[in-house]
Regions:
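Extracytosolic and intramembrane catalytic regions of membrane-associated proteins
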Residues: 21-59, 67-68, 520-644
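Alpha-helical transmembrane segments of integral membrane proteins
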Residues: 268-574, 578-579, 605-607, 611-615, ...
Length: 644
């Protein structure tokens, strides 16, 4: 027996009284008391045992029916238990509204998601189960709501799930509903492109709906009064708008007004900008009093541009190699590792500069200036092709570069470098505030495609860095400095850059990354107490297959129960009255048992005859201490010999 100790957020005493099937039954009783028709949606439809279940209330249109999607409103049973009067009032008001579309309230079980037992991932939740059982996702759209335990004043609107995002019509209706009620709100996932690129993973419950083709949005209320925004949303919903599916949008809220930029406006902006860029590059680059020298430099050294790009990509691979093989870097947190990769890239680029000086290759401001403008312009179109909403970020960077292109003094170059960072700061802050440690590895141990994209983003900054090195060389007024002295200036400058990157990594880790990831991992402590879990298997070989019944008995209510069957010979399970997942090796089956199972239940399954297997049952129990959980495991070896 083991004890798992963890430190979750505090829960109210009231909420702890009902869990699992008891909470589902309470939900039914409250709906029945309020005269609402409902039906039960089983999470584990075995027909024998009572597990937690979803409860569905469907409200038909009160106006003549039109071709409209059904609005799904999902509320966890835990939240319903906390705020029954307010939620029942919302259902009643919705029922009385004049609507031309159906509404379904779904009270979901087991949605108070937790990570107590990270080693066991195959557990059911009401929202995912409901979404996975919809026949045709295109006939629905969903609004998921939950109530935050934290007391901050603003409600939150979530617009991404997995790599998918809420369409503009649904986001706009929701935002307008909050604004019209003067309810303060925030949108943590405004930068949709980060999620669509797979750098961050959006809300898991929303992802379950997007997977089934259901458009959705999620609202998190910090105060129960904020639910009036949802009421306003239902009242003012216009079914005809849900035909639009524009997900490439952005918006800005100022005071009580919102400015939306849809996909059409983004495309139009890219086209106009493209004409301006061509004008700047072709017509203006080779004009002025130095036009003849500029043309001469370009014709002689244009191959230097792809060479620099290759050097930039190569520098990232060197940084990546060091992060993987140097222990003091590889053991650091992911933010520090990524910062180290960037710093090593700066060192490699600095060495490349020394190589240029030694071979007397071009180090003129014009060549560097033309390269940075060309690549920043190319970035606009390359990244806009991937996601058009990032156009504004790279366009702003381009204008900063263009209007500071003639900077030659050291201070002006540093200011230019700092200004170029501004368009990306919000992306950096959002990314490191929400990324998980395994996901950030995509930037540290990157493949060819990711390193090329990183290189294109970093390239303008690397060029400004080289322009700074050129300027340092000019400051000394001795262009015939020895390579040793130039190297000294270069690496002193690189040390300054290293200090800046280190400071940035420290501040990001301390005030952004750790705020999201600073939790204490569960601890497993060995202990021996009386047994709560008992298991027994009965086999029957009367048919062509071996039929087995696994009886599980528990002295007290378990929080979670996991069951897996492994066989070293054949497929471990051929059929069962419970859903199960056969793992990659095809020799282990993991059963999907909802949390808070009955104290006594049976699993029926069939296997091939003459197949030996090991059945492992693990149950987790609460203790007198709220922060402790017992873990008991029972393993049974079943011989492949004929059942007796």
């Amino acid at each position: 027996m083991n004890y798992i100790i963890f430190y979750p957020q505090a829960q109210s005493a009231k909420k702890q009284f009902l869990k699992g099937a008891e909470l589902s039954l309470y939900t039914e009783q409250m709906l029945e008391k309020s005269d609402f028709s409902f039906h039960r949606l089983e999470l584990a439809p075995t027909g024998n045992d009572i597990f937690p279940f979803n409860v569905n209330v469907r409200l038909e249109p009160s106006l003549p029916a039109v071709s409209a999607k059904t609005m799904l409103i999902l509320v966890s049973q835990e939240d319903f238990f906390e705020y029954p009067e307010e939620i029942l009032s919302l259902v009643e008001k919705t029922k009385k509204m004049k609507r031309a579309f159906p509404v379904e309230f779904v009270f979901t079980a087991l949605d108070d998601r937790n990570n107590l037992f990270p080693e066991y991932k195959f557990f059911l939740q009401g929202t995912e189960n409901f979404a996975g059982n919809l026949d045709d996702g295109s006939e629905y759209f969903a609004v998921l709501i939950n109530f935050s335990k934290n007391t901050k004043a603003k409600a939150e609107i979530f617009t991404t799930g997995g790599k998918s995002s809420t369409p503009m019509w649904l986001a706009k209706e929701t935002v307008d509903s909050f604004l019209s009620k003067n309810i303060p709100f925030s949108v943590p996932q405004k930068l949709l492109s980060i999620y669509r690129a797979g750098l961050l993973f959006g809300d898991e419950q929303m992802a379950a709906f997007f997977k089934e083709g259901v458009q959705c949005i999620k609202l998190q209320f910090s105060k129960v009064e904020q639910i009036s925004a949802l009421e306003n949303f239902i009242q003012n919903h216009i079914p005809s708008q849900n035909e639009k599916n524009d997900v490439h949008y952005s918006f800005i809220t100022l005071a009580n007004h919102t400015f939306w930029i849809n996909e059409f406006k983004n495309i139009l902006s890219v086209e106009i900008f493209g004409i301006l860029v061509i004008l700047f590059l072709v017509c203006f680059t080779f004009t002025g009093k130095n036009r003849l020298q500029s043309k001469k430099d370009f014709s002689r050294y244009w191959l230097f541009i792809p060479a620099m790009l290759c050097a930039s990509v190569f520098s990232l691979y060197i940084g990546q190699f060091c992060c993987k093989n140097l222990a003091f870097i590889s053991q650091a947190n992911p933010v520090i590792q990524f910062a180290a990769k960037l710093f090593i890239s700066v060192i490699v680029i600095s060495v490349f500069f020394l190589f240029q000086v030694h071979l007397k290759l071009p180090v003129t401001s014009f060549i560097y200036g033309f390269m940075i403008i060309l690549v920043s312009a190319a970035n606009i179109f390359l990244f806009s092709m991937a996601d058009i909403t990032v156009f504004w970020v790279f366009a702003l960077e381009y204008f900063i570069i263009y209007f500071t292109r003639n900077s030659s003094k050291l201070l002006s170059l540093i200011i230019s470098f700092s200004l170029m960072l501004l368009p990306f700061l919000s992306y950096v802050a959002v990314y490191f505030a929400n990324v998980n440690a395994p996901d950030i590895k995509i930037l540290i141990s990157s493949g060819k495609q990711v390193n090329i994209m990183l290189s294109l983003i970093l390239f303008p900054f690397q060029i400004v860095w080289l322009k700074i090195l050129v300027r340092l060389r000019v400051i000394n007024k001795d262009k015939s400095l020895s390579l040793k002295k130039i190297a000294g200036f270069t690496f002193i400058s690189a040390a300054i850059i290293a200090a800046v990157i280190t400071l940035f990594a420290f501040l990001t880790t301390e005030f952004v990354y750790n705020k999201k990831h600073g939790f204490e991992k569960p601890q497993i402590l060995e202990d021996s107490t009386e047994k709560n879990l008992f298991c027994k298997i009965f086999n029957d070989d009367s048919s062509m297959l071996r039929s087995s019944r696994l009886k599980i008995k528990s002295k007290k209510q378990a929080v979670r129960c996991s069951v897996n069957i492994s066989s070293g010979q054949n497929t471990p399970v051929l059929d069962s009255n419970y859903s199960y997942l056969v793992l990659n090796n095809s020799k282990t089956a993991d059963f999907n048992i909802p949390d808070f199972p009955p104290q006594n239940f049976e699993i029926e399954f069939s296997t091939e005859k003459n197949t030996s297997k090991i059945v492992t049952v693990t149950s987790y129990y609460t203790t007198e201490n709220q922060n402790e959980f017992e873990k008991e495991t029972v393993s049974i070896f079943v011989s492949g010999d004929k059942a007796k």
